[in-house]
Every structure is written in C-alpha cells, then in structure tokens.
Amino acid sequence: MLTKEFNFDLPEELIAQSPSEKRGGDRLLILDKQSGKLEDRLFTELPEILPKNALMVFNNSKVRHARIYAKSKTNAVCEFLMINPMRDSDGSLWQVMAKKAKRQKPGKTFLFEDGTEAEIIESEIPLESEFRCMKFNRVIDDEWLDKYGHMPLPPYIHRKDTQEDADRYQTVYAEIYGSIAAPTAGLHFTQEVLSKIRDKGIDIEYVTLHVGLGTFLPVRAEKIEDHKMHTEHFFISEKTAQAVEKAKKEGRPIIAVGTTTVRTLESAWDEKRKELKWGNQSTDIFIYPSYKFKLIDKLFTNFHTPESSLVMLVSALAGKENIFKAYRHAVEEKYKFFSYGDAMLIL
C-alpha cells in the first residue's frame, strides 16, 4: 500500500492555530464504522452518546516544556527539541532534534539564558540526520525545562507559544512528565465532562505512553509497509490491566481516548492468555490497514495530518473509505483539524 494513498486536500484555514475559546467547546463528528453514517454533534454531548457499560482508557502522560533556545558563539539563536535523556546518563546527556541541523556539528557550544552551557558531541549510537547528542554542564530535569523551556507546539501552528498553551496544550488529567507532544484527543476533556461520564456508570482508567518520535514523525517510505516506527515507552498499572481484562471478558465496549492509548493497549494485550501485560514496557507497533485489532473497537480521536501513521491507524480501525468520507465531510463542514482542532468518535 502506498503512503500517497493517505493524502488528502486540506485548506490551510482549517488547521487550528489556537485552542477553542473554552476547553471542551469543540465540535464532534461521529462515525459509525459499520454503516459509514456520519453525525455532527458537540463535544459537550459526548457523555450522552457513549454506551453506558463502556470502559474508557486515557493517556495521562504530561507534555514537557521541551522546546529550548540557546545562543551559539556567534550569538545566533538556535532552537532544539529535547527528545529524551540518553540511556545510562545522569540527566546531563540528551538526544535533541536540532532546527537547521546541518549547522549543528559536534564541538559546537551553546549558552542558555540561565548560564547553562551545552555542547554537541559525537553520539555512541547512530542517530538520524536531524538528531544530535547534546552534553550539558548540569543535570537537565523537568523543573529546569518548566522554567526555561517552551511548549513544543507542532510546526503547523505558525506562532510562538504563550502562557495559555502551558494550560491548553496539556490534558486536565496529565500526571507524569515525558511527552514531547500532547496526546491531543485528551485536550477536549474537562473535569465536568469526566464527572458526567463517571455519573453515567462508565469506568475510566489511565495508561501512560510518553508521546515521542514514533507518534509524530512523518511516514517517509513510499510503501507504508517499509515504514519503521520509533520506539516509545509506556506504563500500565495492575489496576488498569485488571479493569481492561474484566471489560474484555464481559464483552463491554473498550473506548480508547487517542491513538497513543490504542497503540499502548494493542501492544500489551496477550491474545492467548487474554491478559493485559502491566508494568513498564515499550512499543514500536505500526497500525495500518490489514491490522487485526485484538482489544479496541471504539476510538475518540482528533483529525490527523495527511500521510501520517495516525491517519493510517484510524483507517485500519474504521476502514479507509469511511475515514476519507468522514474527512471530506469535515472539510466541507469546516471542522478544525489537528492538535487544537475538533474531535471525532469512531463507534
């Protein structure tokens, strides 16, 4: 299957540049994957739409203030995205994504606003062209990033981050730092909507998948079967595992909130034992049409970028024809797309 088959036309003005005025003030497109029927609703109506006996699973990873700026020796301002600390380092050695990467060669040094210094060094492991290994003269932790870093808004949002983004590019239930992009399906949810969902008798559980390169890097291969996902790390508690196993055994609907939750649950499910493996794990699962889902058959998600692994995942779940019909409808009805855009519920 060719990557270009997952391309679609999207007017620039439908790419949301800011969140809705109020969290949860978004539109909701419902897709019945069996019939292909579409229904235009509001996100605030979600609790009344969801099946009563469902289990909803959310990703509670918290977005790092991972975009940082520094000055080079020539006083040029340079931008980096802090991906993750290098394995076995004390927190002073990080894998970073460099803007204008060709200029950032080993030996180049940088100065940050608080006086922290860093140097690009040769990596002991192979890195792709835009990535670098950066050695700091101190431990870099989330406390430092909170103070000196910026929210890593995606490149299709053509503005600098603001104080509002520190709140709105984070879910209300985010708990554990580690993501370099928001698990965006969750951005719609307010505490009020979550309470209404619980009041309806729907169970809510959480997993933690730290959104990394696997989620947001483009599919560069001509054939999707040749695409390799970057590894992302996740955690499932014993409590969540037991709740998922119980729902599966009882034949209740399991609704994933976001594609990261889908990838987490599908990766951890042991079909033979009918068990969800719990604890710290990692995944490079790539879900595209022809994938047979083991656990998930319903999904709350956003509208995704053309030719992305995410639009391939939703096509695997609902059928490519259904998804592209829904996306054409969304364009015609002027739904907002991507991270700060409107939502979609696949039933």
From Swiss-Prot:
Subcellular location: Cytoplasm
Key word Transferase present: yes
EC number(s) given by UniProt: 2.4.99.17
Catalytic activity, as annotated: 7-aminomethyl-7-carbaguanosine(34) in tRNA + S-adenosyl-L-methionine = epoxyqueuosine(34) in tRNA + adenine + L-methionine + 2 H(+)
Top-level taxon: Bacteria
A Pfam family the protein falls into: Queuosine_synth
Pathway annotation: tRNA modification; tRNA-queuosine biosynthesis
GO term, biological process aspect, one: tRNA wobble guanine modification
GO molecular function annotations of the record: S-adenosylmethionine:tRNA ribosyltransferase-isomerase activity
The entry's keywords: Cytoplasm, Queuosine biosynthesis, S-adenosyl-L-methionine, Transferase
Entry GO CC: cytoplasm
SUPFAM superfamilies, sorted: QueA-like
Function: Transfers and isomerizes the ribose moiety from AdoMet to the 7-aminomethyl group of 7-deazaguanine (preQ1-tRNA) to give epoxyqueuosine (oQ-tRNA).
Family designation: Belongs to the QueA family.
Subunit structure: Monomer.
NCBIfam families (UniProt xref): PRK00147.1, queA
Protein name per UniProt: S-adenosylmethionine:tRNA ribosyltransferase-isomerase
Gene (UniProt): queA
